[in-house]
A protein has these predicted regions:
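Active-site-proximal loop/turn and secondary-structure-junction residues that shape catalytic pockets
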Residues: 11-13, 48-51, 79-83, 119-121, ...
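Surface-exposed, active-site-proximal loop segments in enzymatic domains
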Residues: 15-24, 48-61, 81-91, 182-187, ...
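Histidine-acidic metal/acid-base catalytic patches
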Residues: 1-6, 33-38, 68-71, 122-144, ...
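Conserved beta-strand positions in the central sheet of alpha/beta enzyme cores
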Residues: 8, 44, 76, 114, ...
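Active-site acidic/histidine proton-transfer and metal-coordination neighborhood
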Residues: 1, 6, 29, 34-37, ...
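Active-site anion-binding loops
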Residues: 14-32, 36-42, 97
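A short beta-strand-loop structural module common to alpha/beta enzyme folds
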Residues: 5-16
Length: 246
């Protein structure tokens, strides 16, 4: 109803499981058919796993194959767990080696892994850019989350994005309300992020990466499905008012 034609599926363990590798194949086909009937194209999948933990790599490899099944172009992951406790940590060089080992599978399935600005260790674009540059592959780029860099990294996204524009291939466009450390992520245009400045920076750099809307509300949640629908509609209106096609 809001006018979107593209969707980011989520296979994030313990948080949002739109789809998951252990779902019955028949159920995955039903979801695929549902997307087609509603003319929604799953161009990406959020498949967060701790890429520092060897025991979680097989889970992520399954998510890669699941993303390919749905015809996605991008798979999103934080370096550490997004919403579970980390069972392993590693320095940036170890992370680069671990992620580099995934490149053959990414190439096999024609996917780009976009690493999300998430968590205290990797909460800014500047930090992630160092890892992505070390990996040095077109198959591994940054998913820049505009609100996470405030919440986790304590930086201004307008300035931080300038440090990693060349490495950014995907953006979670998410607004930020309240204090920097408050879990408050409203509809676009309802918070205090200077999105026009971000759009100007992307345009000046010739960066036409896809924008994926993320709305996480407050710890109390949206309150109702109608409130979710309204937030999505408000975000769509905000983007179209700034010249974007949905």
């Amino acid at each position: 109803r809001a006018g979107f034609h593209y969707i980011e599926l989520t296979a994030t363990k313990g948080w949002t499981e739109h789809v998951f590798p252990d779902m019955p194949f028949e159920r995955l086909l039903e979801i695929q058919d549902l997307l087609r009937r509603n003319e929604l194209i799953p161009f990406s999948m959020s498949g967060h796993c701790n890429l520092m933990d060897p025991e979680r790599i097989p889970d992520f490899e399954k998510n890669i194959r699941l993303a390919a099944f749905f015809g996605c172009q991008y798979i999103v992951s934080s370096i550490g767990e997004a919403h579970l406790a980390n069972q392993a940590v590693a320095d940036d060089h170890q992370v680069a080696r671990s992620v580099s080992a995934l490149i053959p599978m990414l190439e096999q399935h024609n996917l780009t892994l976009v690493l999300e600005t998430h968590g205290k260790e990797h909460g800014t674009g500047e930090k992630l850019a160092r890892i992505v540059r070390e990996i040095d592959s077109p198959r591994v780029k940054i998913n820049y989350d505009t609100a996470n860099v405030i919440f986790y990294g304590g930086v201004d996204p307008v300035q931080d994005l300038k440090t990693c524009l060349s490495e950014t291939a995907y953006i979670h466009i998410k607004d930020k309300g309240g204090r920097d450390d408050a879990w408050d992520f409203p509809a676009l245009g309802k918070g205090h992020i200077d999105f026009p400045a971000i759009f100007e920076g992307l345009e000046a750099a010739g960066n036409n990466c896809p924008l994926s809307i993320e709305i996480e509300f407050t710890p109390e949640g949206a309150g109702s499905l109608a409130a979710v629908d309204q937030a999505v509609a408000d975000s769509a209106a905000y983007l179209t008012a700034h010249g974007f096609e949905l």
